[in-house]
Amino acid sequence: LKLNYLLNEKWNFETQLESYTPGALQNFSPDLKKTFVSILSVNYISNKINLTAGSIFDQFGNGLIFRAWEDRKLGINNSIFGLNAKFDYKKISVNTITGLQKIGTTLSSGKIYAIDIKYKFLEKFDMETSYVGRHENIDFTNENKPTNINPTTNLISYRINYTGSKFYLNTEIISKSEDFISEYGFISNSNSKKGSAHYLNTGYYSSGIGLDFTFRRLENMSIYSNRNLYANEFNDGILNFIPALTKQYDYSLANINVYQSQPNVSFLDPLLMKAGEIGFQFEFYIKLKKNSFFGGKTGADLNINISNFNNLSGDFSFEEKSYDLDFLNFGQTYFSEQSINLTKNFSNNFSSIFVFINRYYNKRLVEQSAGKVNSKIIVVDNIFNINDTQSIEFDMQHLFNTND
């Protein structure tokens, strides 16, 4: 149950009530139970100032350093309960956030401090910098308590964005201060690592053609409001957003053995040591003209996608839980995929989409389960338009799998 009350042009009140019957929903956090208030906020907006007290949803850049969001279908509400102030001055925009993060029906023990500053040089060019701090006291109960404990983890981001008439460029560099790693749900007293992220997205688009290239390197880039929630399956307490940079499909067989990003450090097995990911995605689109050799009588749309993501390369030590990483070298392959998508109108009433996917998925390394899966997927999707308001769609899908 959600209620929004707009008092006037400047004041807005919002609240949301959630209720769950006994027994956890599939893939929902078991902390979501009974009846509770999940959102409560008051917002004031004037010409240059935007103030919020209560539940805060926001994102810095593309979310690599900070994102507080809600997705009801997945049972996710990672809002910050606190204070948010935004204001503009000439070409500068400032956004500040402080508070505790919502975790199920409670709030985090870690305190969150964040600021984002955007400077717009030109209409098409701007620079941004962000800071996110998580302050959580660590209570080591054993006698090997470290002497150099810093309860605050700091993340700093620098971003450059350019959007032209035919060319665009977005780049981001993030540094993360040293932080203790959680293993098996317990915070390690001897395993603390720094982290970083490097991101580049660039592309070109014109009439009938488009190119897009994305590169990303992640090293120990997960950040949680509570350290003991590290790498939990429900995304409870996560402060940033790191999706897989691979092509998304509408077809059921194409959504088997899909890749999930690997930003975490893991020493669960001597053969499965990980410290992050490095990889890229390239996409090419072209509109094949009518009456051309490839376009035929009615023309066609061709899309080619290539993606490849690997473990970070370097020297790992399982006994010491340490590593010395190479910056740009690629380690073991997590996931690779090449796909071709052809959309063809045969007439005004009938069209087809032809999809071919060649995929490799290292299930053993990504999920710590058995198998290195090689797949080939073929899809033929047909649409027949009966009239302006009615159509019939039928598709054929086939999956060739090995080692799954």
Ranges and model annotations:
Residues A24, F28-L32, A68-E70, G75-N77, ...:
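General N-terminal targeting signals
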Residues L1-D58, L64-R67, G75-T98, S108-F125, ...:
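Beta-barrel outer-membrane channel/assembly domains of diderm bacteria
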Residues E70-R72, N78-L83, K124-F125, N189, ...:
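Short, surface-exposed, polar/charged, turn-prone segments marking secondary-structure boundaries
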Residues E18-Q26, I49, I56-D71, I92, ...:
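Sequence/structural signature of outer-membrane beta-barrel proteins
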Residues I149-D404:
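Exposed, low-structure sequence patches enriched in small/polar residues
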